[in-house]
């Protein structure tokens, strides 16, 4: 379908502009995504704060069966799966905002300015989070890429998909060529050892001052790193934007074929790269190729999981849109998803206290299974906070501040 370049969402000329009900799947996906991010970050980064060895997958302690099982599970469903969900949902959010501005009659330059302010503020929040709490922040990169996406809101869908596909293909071809070259030079075993170094020992944490110093170092390095990250993140964000523009998640029954295709491709990519990557991490597959491919090709699992959720909960969305209450088991996840920024930053506060060598300094020598439980426990705390805020009818404090700084006291007009 071709679109008017200035229209974020195609609407029949004879129909009034509808006010769509709030979608449950994006919030549900955000809530689940935060669990994946918590578990992945504990293994790859937070354990370094306690003085432990970092790893992309976690370590096997005393030949533990549970550690091995955890590594096999997380390489397929956790590591390099949370951030692509985040990327897709952030692009989806840009699409929803663009549609809202169009319905309000904003001219294109003004709409771009509103989106640029919103994601510029997200980048500032990310920079502060990176320096003062966690150098592994992702909001800075997403905010800066969001600024670029503000320029693309009027681009035709076909062009956006072409851009996304081309960037994704180039990224994977370069990654594959690079890893094959490294494997030829280093050998599979040495390459896997290099990959499993995770965040490495470059960012030692001995005091809170070292947290600040490391954050500043990474922030300065982001000047060069974020353009490279954009090759991996932007295709997923563009896909999310198109999903919003086309109303795919808003009407899953109409778009069932697209959702099924996305879910199928995503699951094949996640398992097809994640399972071999797990075998590599356990030393059962003497290569390092899949440890890279799971972070490039395997990211298709992110939008795939979102599509799967849309298919599974299509009936629930229809009933909620008709006025039915959200089912009780889904409410905590949705409450957290609506407050994802607060939940994400709160994770950092919790894990800094738990892992920081200048604080509790726990779990430095923990295996993959125990770190999975620790990450889950930290996520559960954020879930409880979100439920309490929902019960009180309060937004997340960071969401409220972000909205105020982005749109002003009166909000969007």
Q: Model-found features: residue ranges?
A:
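Membrane-proximal cytoplasmic C-terminal regulatory module of class A 7TM GPCRs
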Residues: 394-413
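N-terminal signal-anchor module of multipass membrane proteins
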Residues: 2-90, 94-97
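Long hydrophobic alpha-helical segments that form multi-pass transmembrane helix bundles
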Residues: 166-245
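Solvent-exposed interhelical
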Residues: 148-169, 242-264
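Juxtamembrane membrane-water interface segments that cap and precede transmembrane helices
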Residues: 62-76, 206-222, 284-288
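Kinked, hydrophobic transmembrane alpha-helices enriched for aromatic residues
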Residues: 24-52, 85-93, 123-131, 268-276, ...
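Specific transmembrane alpha-helix
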Residues: 84-99, 139-151, 228-251, 298-318
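Alpha-helical transmembrane segments of multi-pass integral membrane proteins
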Residues: 287-392
């Amino acid at each position: 379908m071709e679109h008017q370049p200035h229209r974020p969402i195609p609407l029949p000329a004879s129909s009034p502009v509808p006010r769509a009900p709030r979608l449950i799947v994006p919030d549900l996906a955000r809530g689940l995504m935060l669990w994946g991010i918590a578990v992945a970050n504990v293994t790859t980064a937070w354990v370094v704060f306690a003085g432990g060895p970092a790893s992309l997958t976690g370590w096997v302690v005393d030949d533990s069966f549970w550690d091995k099982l955890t590594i096999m599970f997380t390489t397929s469903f956790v590591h390099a799966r949370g951030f692509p969900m985040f990327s897709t949902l952030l692009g989806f959010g840009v699409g929803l905002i663009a549609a809202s501005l169009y319905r309000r009659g904003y001219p294109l330059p003004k709409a771009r300015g509103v989106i640029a302010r919103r994601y510029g503020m997200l980048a500032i929040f990310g920079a502060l989070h990176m320096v003062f709490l966690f150098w592994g922040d992702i909001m800075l990169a997403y905010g800066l890429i969001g600024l670029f996406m503000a320029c693309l809101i009027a681009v035709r869908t076909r062009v956006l998909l072409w851009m996304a596909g081309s960037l994704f293909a180039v990224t994977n071809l370069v990654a594959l060529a690079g890893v094959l070259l490294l494997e030829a030079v280093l050998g599979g075993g040495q390459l896997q050892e290099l990959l499993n170094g995770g965040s490495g020992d470059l960012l030692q944490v001995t005091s809170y001052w070292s947290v600040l110093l490391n954050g500043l170092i990474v922030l300065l390095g982001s000047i060069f790193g974020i353009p490279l990250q954009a090759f991996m993140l932007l295709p997923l964000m563009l896909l999310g934007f198109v999903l919003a523009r086309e109303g795919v998640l808003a009407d899953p029954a109409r778009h069932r074929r697209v959702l099924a295709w996305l879910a199928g491709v995503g699951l094949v990519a996640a398992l097809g790269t994640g399972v071999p990557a797990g075998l590599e991490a356990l030393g059962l597959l003497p290569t390092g190729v899949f440890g890279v491919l799971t972070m490039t090709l395997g990211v298709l699992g992110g939008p795939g999981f979102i599509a799967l959720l849309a298919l599974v909960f299509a009936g629930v969305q229809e009933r909620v849109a008709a006025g039915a209450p959200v089912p009780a088991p889904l409410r905590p996840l949705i409450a957290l998803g609506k407050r994802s920024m607060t939940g994400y930053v709160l994770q950092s506060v919790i894990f800094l206290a738990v892992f920081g060598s200048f604080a509790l300094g726990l779990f430095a020598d923990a295996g993959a299974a125990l770190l999975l439980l620790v990450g889950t426990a930290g996520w559960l705390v954020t879930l409880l906070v979100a439920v309490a805020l929902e019960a009180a009818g309060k937004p997340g404090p960071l969401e409220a501040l972000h909205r105020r700084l982005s749109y002003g006291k009166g909000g969007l007009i």
